[in-house]
Amino acid sequence: MKLLVFSTVIPTKKNLRVKTFETLHKALKKRIPTELIWVVYQPDQFEKIMMDDQTIYCIQDFNDGVDLLKKLNPDLVLVPNRKEPIQHSASLAGKTLGIPLIGFSGAKIDNRLFGEKFENMKVEGQTRAAFKKLLQNKLPADSEEQSKFLRRARFFLYKYRFFIKTQLSVKRNIFKIFFLLLRDFVNFGSSASLPFNTSLDHYLLHDKLEVGRHQYYGIPAEKISVVGNPLLDDIFHKISTVKTRTKINNQIKILIFTDSLYEHGIWSYKERESFLKNLFGKLQEDKTILFDIKIHPTTESETYYQGLFKKLGLSAKIFQSEDLYDLINNYDIIVTYGVSTTHTELSLCGKKTILISTKHLPTFLLVDEAIKAELIRQCNNFMDLIPLIHDFHEQEINLTNEFIEQRDKYFYKFDGKSGKRAADSIIQFFETMKSKSN
């Protein structure tokens, strides 16, 4: 079976989408021979990459979605259930060419991302952040060397041209194309969610709570499979390895998890610089505290942090591609900020975490519950950070029964087998479609 998927990064970089597809591919291969075809959409062109039973193509090798599917000829196409321009182009082409389409809930820890403070996210702030992002000279996954004038805006226009050319290839009415163009730009300006894609042949959902949402859009129950979240499989197997570090002398080892608030247009360059200088400066005041940092694996620049450390005279280690679970047992406490799926992972594994308040950002799923269970402590002022670290270091923490109940409520079948269930559903759908075509 040839399965086509899309990514914003070459899959040697391990973002959430890449991890999702790798989990599915691993589960599929246990059942049937499966070739995973990647199409990467990014501004820079690259040559085709071959890796065992995976092939990686550049979006710029194709004129539009129809051209792409004709050349790659997949058996199935896996796309999100929202209409992102490139992947929606593939779904339009798939409908025209008769190639089956499977929708998935997205490469997220959970679709209900935010906790109780979500109402604090103002639409005005989101709109401003959206346009700040568009005017940036880099995409989130770019290095400093890739920075070019309005690179992000120009690539946004490239994606939309690709989408328009696909619509013309499938003979969509020109007035409808214009209407959709206008609607999408209004949605972008207001930071509205991408439109729901109701034209897919089957849907893989994270949990039962999503079923009603899909049926609201007219998706019949027979087109839906609730499989759980494949991203959680790896977390399920790794959280049992998380341990408390053995105390050595009076030293406290801190690992700082940064957040790409600047790269996503929420912070300005100066805001990021000021926050980090204040954070590092405060930690340096206590000689018993040693710290290193873990930056985002794809969206943050290691070069930036190396330059900042040199400017501040810091010798801390900078981790980027390393797995969270390979690092945290070497540290007593995690210090973090912003809004990140990493916060949900830290909640799940019960690692001592201090969350520094930043603006009025919401919390991700399960973080509020972890705060209530005292697995996560909040810091609202840098003046309180050092005493909080020492107090938390002496405290013993355990997963409470109430916390475990909430975890099981939020995550459908948190058992490490979601990838297998998704693979079983994909294969069953594939065989059904194949028998119909024969």
List each language-model region with its residue ranges:
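A nucleotide-sugar donor-handling region in carbohydrate enzymes
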Residues: 136-264, 401-404
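N-terminal pre-catalytic "stem/leader" segment of glycosyltransferase-like enzymes
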Residues: 1-133, 139-154, 263, 268-269, ...
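C-terminal alpha-helical cap of glycosyltransferases
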Residues: 414-438
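Catalytic donor nucleotide-activated moiety binding site of glycosyltransferases and closely related
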Residues: 38-55, 160-171, 257, 280-321, ...
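Donor nucleotide-activated moiety binding/catalytic core segment of transferases
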Residues: 54-72, 297-343, 348
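Conserved catalytic-core segment of nucleotide-activated headgroup transferases in glycan assembly
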Residues: 14-26, 231-308
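Catalytic binding pocket for nucleotide-activated donors in carbohydrate/polymer assembly enzymes
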Residues: 338-414
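A donor-sugar binding/catalytic signature common to diverse glycosyltransferases
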Residues: 76-89, 215, 321-367
